[in-house]
């Protein structure tokens, strides 16, 4: 099969975001071509998945292939952020049997996704690099004023190193899934920006004969994450099905540079010394041996001012990336890939015009990035326990949008009109840090029982007063923990429910085979008094979190 001269949608990049978008579009009958520069299977970091991945994969009928492949099942994850006992997120307790995720070898998992796109009708080619994009000016369509001169993409040039072949392909839509290279963001839009508060460097390698966290318990084989004792970063330990264990060190770049300078250590010296001084990880390595060369990466966190323009969608790491702390990379990749596919279909089907589709996708990607950024910032603040300017480079519009969900709970008011201040951002992070505090299931059940028992006739404000008057100091702390866990939307890690109910510009996704697109949002009927109180407190209608509530 040869690369065609024309297609409806060209997807550049065959990682999770690109392969997912290509599969979703091809299943809708869209003429889709997927070009990947590397030859599969190809290496990639990011082995630990979130349970939400299963639900994204199920939408394109790919979950059963992951289940049968032999990857290590991930029933949860352990996080030791400070001197207190590690916290454990239990996927099975929250979602029931079959709610596990996986620890994957990315070269194999990504290849599964790439092949699946082809099996579902996309024309897929690896070893083919896209070198340039040609744009044409269009009138009357722009969302981001800074991109008004870009125009719409109409063709791409490609080359194949193995054969020496070269060519070009024209298209109606382009999806940029080129990973950290970010072809469109860095070469054409030139709108990528790094978060200076998350200037980290990571080094990692693969060990043989490493021990496992939780041996003899249902937690055996789950990833283990531990903070470095001086607060400069953290270490991951992820068992893989090929018999190796991925162990990585993520450290603030300034701290890593200072430690090397003070001790004369090499990158490998710093890596090994850090692991030796991380007790929980080191005790699992008494018989282990580092069997690979170290790999390194820096500048983990970046985003952009826009993730779409007319007839163009940017997905996955090509647009933004945070930090591997909560395994958010593949989650955000698949979410953005699905967003790209459904907004293209929405415009094609007439659900909305192209400008509205562009706006929806860009806001959806920005919101997902911002929510996970808040989670990571809260966790890193818990690790470092010191003031750091972690959100100096945030996207104000998207953070304002995400903060709309947080401010009423933190301030006890529904006022969401004013712009954010740095103090409010700090307050948000401080509040969300409470999500990492311990609260037993019994303690949470007791508090939620009291929430359900409130039957005030004085409206929501009266119900809030009655509730807080009925709670002890310890119960109020437990309530704060429950609220914080809902603010950081921990259920996003379990399923894709929130993907289908998030209202952006008055529209919600329609995730139906053969009808993929956007639909106008229709508000629900009046809620009950208890539901209203739960909503005001930021508590869930039903138990669906990786935490107890």
UniProtKB/Swiss-Prot annotation:
This is Flavin-dependent halogenase aclH. Flavin-dependent halogenase; part of the gene cluster that mediates the biosynthesis of aspirochlorine (or antibiotic A30641), an unusual halogenated spiro compound with distinctive antifungal properties due to selective inhibition of protein biosynthesis, and which is also active against bacteria, viruses, and murine tumor cells. The non-ribosomal peptide synthetase (NRPS) aclP is responsible the formation of the diketopiperazine (DKP) core from the condensation of 2 phenylalanine residues. GO terms for biological process: secondary metabolite biosynthetic process. The keyword Metal-binding does not apply. Belongs to the flavin-dependent halogenase family. Its EC number is 1.14.14.-. It comes from Aspergillus oryzae (strain ATCC 42149 / RIB 40) (Yellow koji mold). It is an enzyme of class 1 (oxidoreductase).
